A protein has these predicted regions:
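A short, structured active-site edge motif that brings together acidic residues
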Residues: 63-68, 75, 80-97
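Short coil/turn segments at beta-strand junctions that form active-site/ligand-binding loops
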Residues: 58, 108-111, 131
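Conserved phosphoryl-transfer catalytic core
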Residues: 1-32
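Acidic, Mg2+-coordinating phosphoryl-transfer loop and its flanking beta/alpha structural elements
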Residues: 113-114, 118-157
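Short acidic-hydrophobic, aromatic-tinged amphipathic segments that line or gate anion-handling sites
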Residues: 86-92, 153-161
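Short, charged, surface-exposed secondary-structure boundary motifs
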Residues: 95-100, 142-151, 165-167
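Short, acidic loop-to-helix structural element flanking the phosphoryl-transfer center
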Residues: 20-23, 31-61, 68-75
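Conserved Lys-Pro-Asp/Glu-containing loop-to-beta segment of HAD-superfamily phosphomonoesterases
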Residues: 95-125
């Protein structure tokens, strides 16, 4: 994989030839990848412990743009890592889904949204302006290609910083901070 741009299509190369895989081939490869590898994806450093700790104070929900038919594979992968959180599959921008989730709560709650994709951060910020939007990219190679969107409350590169930020901001008035 080359990381010339912050996307998968165009950055995947054939191992033997080094030739980039074109869009039509990617449309065939990606469904197979989700089908065979979703259950095998490794968790990110510190994510398990941080989410378990935060779950004492917050309802953790995994909102993923994984194909709906592969949802149970994601659930199994999380459960295998002792991360028993609800999983909701989505297609497209995540703002509307977050708004629907929050609209279902009977009381006003403090909400945090963590994502790597700037368009999802923008979408959630627009649809649910009270939500604290955290732009998270752990891989420094990708961070160089994907700047933090202006709509993000803050940006982090590791889960321990996210944990500290959320714990520090559970009971404040939700004013956006910059860093």
């Amino acid at each position: 994989m080359d990381l010339d741009e912050p996307r998968i299509t165009g950055n995947i190369k054939e191992i033997k030839t080094g030739k980039r895989i074109d869009n039509l081939d990617m449309n065939k490869i990606m469904p197979d990848f989700f089908k065979t590898e979703t259950e095998n994806l490794k968790i990110i450093n510190n994510s398990k412990n941080v989410l378990k700790k935060l779950s004492k104070f917050l309802q953790i929900i995994v909102l993923t743009n994984l194909p709906h038919k592969d949802k149970n594979k994601r659930v199994k992968a999380l459960q295998r890592n002792d991360m028993n959180f609800p999983v909701i599959t989505n297609s497209g921008l995540k703002g509307e889904a977050v708004k629907k989730i929050l609209d279902k709560t009977k009381i006003k709650v403090k909400s945090f949204f963590i994502d790597d994709m700037p368009l999802n951060i923008d979408s959630v910020s627009k649809e649910s302006s009270d939500t604290v939007c955290i732009h998270f990219i752990q891989d420094k190679r990708i961070k160089k290609l994907m700047p933090t969107p202006k709509s993000a409350t803050i940006s982090f590169h590791n889960w321990l910083d996210i944990e500290n930020f959320i714990l520090d901001n559970l009971n404040d008035d939700g004013e956006k901070e910059t860093q």
